[in-house]
A protein has these predicted regions:
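Short amphipathic alpha-helical segments that mediate assembly, nucleic-acid/protein binding
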Residues: 1-5, 70-74, 90-96
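Short cysteine-rich loop/turn motifs with clustered Cys
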Residues: 1-31, 53-55, 60
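Residues that flank catalytic or metal-binding motifs in active/ligand-binding sites
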Residues: 14, 31, 47-49, 77-79
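Short cysteine/histidine-rich metal-coordination sites, predominantly Zn2+-binding motifs
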Residues: 34-41, 67-75
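Short beta-strand-alpha-helix junction that forms the catalytic/metal-binding core
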Residues: 40-59
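Short flanking/linker segments adjacent to small metal-binding domains or redox-active Cys/His motifs
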Residues: 78-115
Length: 115
């Protein structure tokens, strides 16, 4: 396992759910998401990473392209969590869930309309 991921798992007590609330089935499923993009001078270290499962990582990049407002709200939450150096709180996950619920509902409706 990547040393930075392991270090972050311990700092943020991230063993059951990633930072977007997705269940961690195996630690090897965790990835490092750059909160501030490298091409926008984002650091390549734990001060700029969010711990996301592969599924969440794909989702956040989908949101970046298709739901920019929600992507920015989520990235703001990720940054605040990163800077706190503490484990995600219940309030944090509730806020994340609220944003994701809106997006997932819209995605589901769009899929229905295509059928």
């Amino acid at each position: 396992m990547n040393e930075e991921i392991l270090q972050m798992m311990n700092i943020y007590n991230t063993f059951n759910f990633d930072w977007m609330g997705d269940e961690i089935k195996t630690p090897s499923d965790l990835t490092r998401h750059h909160i501030k993009k490298k091409q926008h001078d984002g650091e390549n270290n734990i001060n700029n990473y969010a711990l996301l499962t592969t599924n969440s990582h794909h989702l956040i990049h989908y949101l970046e392209v298709n739901y920019n407002k929600e992507y920015n709200l989520i990235n703001k939450l990720l940054l605040e969590l990163n800077e706190s150096k503490k484990e995600p709180t219940e309030e944090y996950f509730l806020e994340m869930k609220k944003i994701l619920k809106i997006v997932k509902k819209d995605i589901k409706n769009k899929k229905r309309k295509r059928k």
